Amino acid sequence: MWKLWRAEEGAAALGGALFLLLFALGVRQLLKQRRPMGFPPGPPGLPFIGNIYSLAASSELPHVYMRKQSQVYGEIFSLDLGGISTVVLNGYDVVKECLVHQSEIFADRPCLPLFMKMTKMGGLLNSRYGRGWVDHRRLAVNSFRYFGYGQKSFESKILEETKFFNDAIETYKGRPFDFKQLITNAVSNITNLIIFGERFTYEDTDFQHMIELFSENVELAASASVFLYNAFPWIGILPFGKHQQLFRNAAVVYDFLSRLIEKASVNRKPQLPQHFVDAYLDEMDQGKNDPSSTFSKENLIFSVGELIIAGTETTTNVLRWAILFMALYPNIQGQVQKEIDLIMGPNGKPSWDDKCKMPYTEAVLHEVLRFCNIVPLGIFHATSEDAVVRGYSIPKGTTVITNLYSVHFDEKYWRDPEVFHPERFLDSSGYFAKKEALVPFSLGRRHCLGEHLARMEMFLFFTALLQRFHLHFPHELVPDLKPRLGMTLQPQPYLICAERR
C-alpha cells in the first residue's frame, strides 16, 4: 500500500512538473507573439501558430494573400509566424526605401531554425550580414566575372551550350515533350563552368538527380511544415514531415557536392585558379592562420550548392515561362522571330551585342520577368539594428519579407498589371524603355550577384531557340497557368511541340 501511494505521489509530481513546464512554454510563446510598441499592424492570428494557418489555409498563393492584406493594413504590415515577428513590405516605394535607402540595416538574414540546420548561417545566400558574407560575396562576384561573363570567350561557351540544347530538342522531331529537364541541364551547365570548370552531359543521371533534389527542396521550403519547424524547432525530433524530407535531400546533395569539389580540385595549382572551387581553396589556404576567417570546407560546400541552385532554378523557370507564353501567344512569338531574322538572320549566330538592336525581344523577356514573378517573396531579410519605416518601429532581428510580386503588380507603376503586355517596355518610337519598378533580382546589398549572367543566358537561349524552332501546344491543349507553390514560382508541367522553322 505504501509503495502504491509513493508511486501515485511520484506520478502526480511528475505530472505537475510537466504541466508547469508546458504552462511556462505556453506563456513564453504567447509573450513572443505580442506585437512590440510601434510595430506595424497586421491580421489577427491564432494562439501559438499565429498567421501560419491563414497562409496555409488560404486558397491564394502566399504572395497574393500578402498583397491583399496590404490593401487592408497598408504597404508595410506585420505577420506572426508562430512567434517569429515578421514585417512584409509591399509596393515599389517601401521596398526601395528599405533595401536601398536603409540598405545596411535591411541586409541581414533571419536566424531561422531551417537556415541554422541547413547551412549553420554560413555559406553565401543565407549567411549573416558581416565579414563572412562580405568575403564570400566578393569572391563569388569576382569569380563570376573572371571565370564567366567578364571573358569574351564565355559567350561562345554559352552559345555552344545552346547548340547542345537545340540539338537535343531536334531529336523529338516535333513530337510533344516536357522542356524542363533539358532546360535545367543546359542552364546549370553555364554555372558549372564557373564553379567546376566543366559541363555535365544531359545523360549524367547523378547530376540530374542532384538538380531534381534541389528543385524539390525549393518547393518544400515554402511548405506549412517548414514554417511550423521554424516556429517550433523541437518538432524536428519527429521522423515525419516535409521538413524531414528536405533535410534528407540536403544530406544527399551535400555528399554529392563534396565529391564534385574533390574531383574539381585534383589538378589544382595553388594561386592559379581555373574556377570558383580553386579560388575558394586559395582563400582557405590564405586564411589558415586567421581565426576569424570564415572560409572552410563546410562553407565551400554550402556556397557551391547555393550558387548552383540560384543560378539554375531562376533562369530555368524564366525560360520555361517564356516558352509557355510564346506558345500561348503565337502572334508575340512571330514578332520575336521576325526581329531575330532581321538582326541575326535565320542561320546567323546569336550575339549578346545584338540585344540593343532587338527592343521587342528585350521587351518580351522583361515582361516575362515582371508577369511571372519567379521569386515572388525574394529571400527573407532581417534587420541588423532597430529601424524606423513610415513611422513604424522595427526592432533589430525582425524577419522582413519583400513582396516583389506586389512591386511588379503595383498599379502606381504598371498599367493593367494583370495583362501580359510586352509593349509596356517600348517607348513611342519603338525603343526599349527600362522601368524602374522592375526588380526581379531584388535591390540593395543583397541583390542577386548573378544578374548579368542570368540576363545573358536568358537572351541567348531564348533567341537561339526561336531562331530554329516554332513552338506550339500539342492539339492546342493549353496548360494550367497557375504556378506551383515554392520559394520560386515554376509552371505546372506542360508539353510543347518544337517544329523546325
UniProtKB/Swiss-Prot annotation:
It is a peripheral membrane protein. It is found in: Endoplasmic reticulum membrane; Microsome membrane. Its EC number is 1.14.14.24. It is an enzyme of class 1 (oxidoreductase). Keywords: Disease variant, Endoplasmic reticulum, Heme, Iron, Lipid metabolism, Membrane, Metal-binding, Microsome, Monooxygenase, Oxidoreductase, Signal. It comes from the Eukaryota. Pathway: Hormone biosynthesis; vitamin D biosynthesis. GO terms for biological process: calcitriol biosynthetic process from calciol; organic acid metabolic process; response to cesium ion; response to ionizing radiation; vitamin D metabolic process; vitamin metabolic process; xenobiotic metabolic process. Residues 1-26 form the signal peptide. Substrate binds at A250. Heme binds at C448. It holds the Pfam family p450. Coiled coil: none annotated. GO terms for cellular component: cytoplasm; endoplasmic reticulum membrane; intracellular membrane-bounded organelle. Its cofactor is heme. It catalyses: calciol + reduced [NADPH--hemoprotein reductase] + O2 = calcidiol + oxidized [NADPH--hemoprotein reductase] + H2O + H(+); vitamin D2 + reduced [NADPH--hemoprotein reductase] + O2 = 25-hydroxyvitamin D2 + oxidized [NADPH--hemoprotein reductase] + H2O + H(+); 1alpha-hydroxyvitamin D2 + reduced [NADPH--hemoprotein reductase] + O2 = 1alpha,25-dihydroxyvitamin D2 + oxidized [NADPH--hemoprotein reductase] + H2O + H(+); alfacalcidol + reduced [NADPH--hemoprotein reductase] + O2 = calcitriol + oxidized [NADPH--hemoprotein reductase] + H2O + H(+). Its main location: endoplasmic reticulum. GO terms for molecular function: D3 vitamins binding; heme binding; iron ion binding; oxidoreductase activity, acting on paired donors, with incorporation or reduction of molecular oxygen, reduced flavin or flavoprotein as one donor, and incorporation of one atom of oxygen; protein homodimerization activity; vitamin D3 25-hydroxylase activity. Changing L99P: In VDDR1B; complete loss of activity. It is linked to Rickets vitamin D-dependent 1B: An autosomal recessive disorder caused by a selective deficiency of the active form of vitamin D (1,25-dihydroxyvitamin D3) and resulting in defective bone mineralization and clinical features of rickets. The patients sera have low calcium concentrations, low phosphate concentrations, elevated alkaline phosphatase activity and low levels of 25-hydroxyvitamin D. Homodimer. Belongs to the cytochrome P450 family. A cytochrome P450 monooxygenase involved in activation of vitamin D precursors. Can metabolize vitamin D analogs/prodrugs 1alpha-hydroxyvitamin D(2) (doxercalciferol) and 1alpha-hydroxyvitamin D(3) (alfacalcidol) forming 25-hydroxy derivatives. Mechanistically, uses molecular oxygen inserting one oxygen atom into a substrate, and reducing the second into a water molecule, with two electrons provided by NADPH via cytochrome P450 reductase (CPR; NADPH-ferrihemoprotein reductase). This is Vitamin D 25-hydroxylase. It comes from Homo sapiens. The lineage of its organism: Eukaryota, Metazoa, Chordata, Craniata, Vertebrata.
